[in-house]
């Protein structure tokens, strides 16, 4: 009996393999975006420059401290940990669904004790009977002739694969978030150093002006103007101290652990990226490699597979229940010859009247597929805009940096000239103060543009799908 049951299981599995499926043929929707990215460099050579998703984050970021901070975040960040656990959960759910493809075989041992009163026995006396049985069998195994179970299995598989892409997408976002937080801290630290230096310079200028005022060489207006600039620099220094502290708190949160002081930057690095320039590539190819786009496509494939299950529900479902074993009135008799028992119960269920439930279920599945198509297309459009915005910013950053550096040089020269003219008695103190303000503002603006340039490299790397390796 046991060998027959095993043979039956093999036959059923083979029958399942040859069963049909009603999942619609999947066709990837066309990307609703232009054929090329605007502002992409025309000299880019795909053969010479690898795509962003092929560049590991360790190879992309130039600063060793930043690489170490990112490595810490990948180990300790809770959001990434949740994404990894979601993969384990989806994998387990897929295994549960996949198990329905095969018969579930179980063993049962039972004892039945029954007492009958004398009125119901031939002897006229009360009798107690016992029955022992031991069986192995399967219960309600569905023969998947129309692919309902396999469609649900395909849906579960796509959902599981989608969580894999979600984890990759979460890692890309984490790498970019850590890099931007680290760079922001570096910029604010540099701004703080500039504010402190400016405060010290203005403090010296204020002290000199006070002495000149006491000697009657300058007016009270000059003294108050010097005091105004001094307090402005003091306020800026306090504000940037607060920004630096907040930056460190944000960095500790995203990393998931306190950071050693030696990993925190005091100024923006000259080059945040070790890669000179990322190629934009062809939108339809580049965007299709982004994990968030792949996740959206997995959701679309899952919805498409669910249509197959909804279609199969219109057709008969056949299930089998079978068991084989032994039975005896005594425990020792279970192993005697002639005690074998077996049962075989096929069951077919044919939907006749469901009050529109099956049609409605199919409509829901098809509408959900259409929703996922729209979400997939929206994800591509959003990704295209991210890349296009980053490229548009990159196209002007070099010019902005050159202009800001030239402005700092010009204002510094103007300040030195104003200082010399003031000391020579040619210009008023007001002209010197204006030159100080202009130079300070130009230096702050240059730090901001340098931060934008570094952050643009991070944004473009993320937008092009880099950072998950």
Describe the predicted segments one by one.
Residues 216-219, 383, 390, 425-428:
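Alpha-helical heptad-repeat coiled-coil segments that mediate oligomerization/polymerization in large
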Residues 2-75, 157, 241-288, 294, ...:
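Terminal intrinsically disordered/low-complexity segments used for targeting and assembly
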Residues 25, 29, 55-56, 64-72, ...:
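Small/polar-residue-enriched beta-strand and adjacent coil segments characteristic
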Residues 92, 99, 165, 172, ...:
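Regular, well-ordered alpha-helical segments
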Residues 219-221, 428-448:
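Short terminal targeting/anchoring segments
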Residues 149, 158, 165-282, 393, ...:
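Periplasmic alpha-helical coiled-coil/stalk elements that build and connect Gram-negative outer-membrane
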Residues 213-217, 422-426, 463-467:
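A short glycine-centered flexible hinge/capping loop motif at secondary-structure junctions
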């Amino acid at each position: 009996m046991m060998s027959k049951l095993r043979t039956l299981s093999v036959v059923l599995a083979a029958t399942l393999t040859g069963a049909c499926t009603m999942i619609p043929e999947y066709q990837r929707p066309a990307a609703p975006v232009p054929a090329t990215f605007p502002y992409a460099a025309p000299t880019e050579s795909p053969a010479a420059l690898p795509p962003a998703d092929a560049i590991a984050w360790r190879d992309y970021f130039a600063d060793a401290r930043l690489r170490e901070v990112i490595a810490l975040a990948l180990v300790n960040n809770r959001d990434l940990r949740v994404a990894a656990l979601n993969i384990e959960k989806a994998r387990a759910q897929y295994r549960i669904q996949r198990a329905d493809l095969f018969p579930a075989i179980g063993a049962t041992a039972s004892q039945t004790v029954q007492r009958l009163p004398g009125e119901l026995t031939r002897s006229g006396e009360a009798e107690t009977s016992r029955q022992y049985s031991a069986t192995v069998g399967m219960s309600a195994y569905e023969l998947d002739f129309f692919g309902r179970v396999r469609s649900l299995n395909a849906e579960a598989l796509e959902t599981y694969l989608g969580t894999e892409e979600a984890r990759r997408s979460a890692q890309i976002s984490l790498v970019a978030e850590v890099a931007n937080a680290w760079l922001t801290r570096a910029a604010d630290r540099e701004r703080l150093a500039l504010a402190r230096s400016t405060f010290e310079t203005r403090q010296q200028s204020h002290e000199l002006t006070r002495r000149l005022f006491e000697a009657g060489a300058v007016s009270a207006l000059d003294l108050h103007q010097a005091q105004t600039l001094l307090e402005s620099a003091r306020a800026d220094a306090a504000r940037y101290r607060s920004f630096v502290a907040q930056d460190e708190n944000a960095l500790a949160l995203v990393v998931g652990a306190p950071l050693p002081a030696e990993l925190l930057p005091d100024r923006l690095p000259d080059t945040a990226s070790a890669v000179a320039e990322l190629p934009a590539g062809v939108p339809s190819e580049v965007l299709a490699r982004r994990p968030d786009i792949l996740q959206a496509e997995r959701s679309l494939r899952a919805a498409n597979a669910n249509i197959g299950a909804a279609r199969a529900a219109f057709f008969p479902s056949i299930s089998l229940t079978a068991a084989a074993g032994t039975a005896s009135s005594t425990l020792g008799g279970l192993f005697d010859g002639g005690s074998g028992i077996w049962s075989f119960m096929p069951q077919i269920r044919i939907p006749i009247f469901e009050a529109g439930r099956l049609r409605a279920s199919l409509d829901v599945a098809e509408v959900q597929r259409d929703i996922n198509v729209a979400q997939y297309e929206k994800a591509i459009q959003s990704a295209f805009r991210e890349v296009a915005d980053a490229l548009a910013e990159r196209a002007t950053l070099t010019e902005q940096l050159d202009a800001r550096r030239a402005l700092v040089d010009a204002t510094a020269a103007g300040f030195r000239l104003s200082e010399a003219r003031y000391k020579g008695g040619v210009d008023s103190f007001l002209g010197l103060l204006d030159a100080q303000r202009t130079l300070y503002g130009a230096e702050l603006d240059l730090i901001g543009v340098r931060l934008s340039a570094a952050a643009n490299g991070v944004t473009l790397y993320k937008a092009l799908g880099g950072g998950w390796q």
